[in-house]
């Protein structure tokens, strides 16, 4: 950090360090409130924030709010049939043999995955393990605001929002 200060660096941007199955290098977040052990502990993060602050360097986190990992508690609860959490994501009731749209995932193949136990499809614009959040749901926006407040209260000075340009989805899927 001293070397960065000597270079007059005033912000340090780090990619996702949260709990993740790492199917997409951490961009598949399973818990926004915990540090992936591959990168250290929450105490390590607190120390990094403090040491950056001591040098006048702001720490900026990369936040992934278009989707979560399918291992996230919200998605697991959605799969368990909890309607509240199904509304956190974009599910469609089309028959198993009828994909809701012809949209393609950025990772290849259809952007929809069928869940036989629910008889529903969920949207994943990226990897099949990255279920898109439903930004039309005010509870989702509220949960994500809590995440931001949590990290701001820890001393994070800025955020980069990954693929924020795709959070808005049309009401009518064609």
Predicted regions span which residues?
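Acidic/aromatic-lined carbohydrate-recognition and catalytic surfaces
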Residues: 1-145, 149, 153, 164-174
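Receiver (REC) domain switch/active-site residues of two-component response regulators
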Residues: 157
């Amino acid at each position: 950090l001293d070397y960065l200060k000597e270079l007059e660096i005033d912000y340090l941007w780090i990619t996702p360090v949260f709990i993740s199955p790492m199917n997409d290098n951490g961009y598949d977040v399973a818990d926004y409130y915990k540090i992936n052990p591959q990168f250290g502990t929450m105490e390590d993060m607190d120390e990094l924030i403090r040491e950056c602050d001591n040098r006048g360097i702001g720490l900026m986190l990369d936040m992934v709010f278009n989707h979560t990992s399918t291992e996230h508690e919200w998605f697991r609860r959605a799969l368990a049939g909890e309607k509240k959490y199904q509304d956190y994501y974009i599910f469609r009731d089309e028959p198993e043999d009828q994909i809701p749209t012809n949209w393609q995932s950025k990772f290849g193949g259809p952007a929809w995955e069928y869940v036989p136990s629910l008889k529903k499809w969920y949207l994943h614009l990226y990897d099949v393990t990255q279920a898109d959040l439903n930004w039309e749901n005010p509870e989702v926006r509220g949960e994500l605001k809590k995440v931001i407040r949590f990290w701001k209260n820890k001393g994070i000075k800025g955020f980069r929002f990954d693929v924020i340009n795709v959070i808005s989805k049309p009401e009518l899927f064609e």
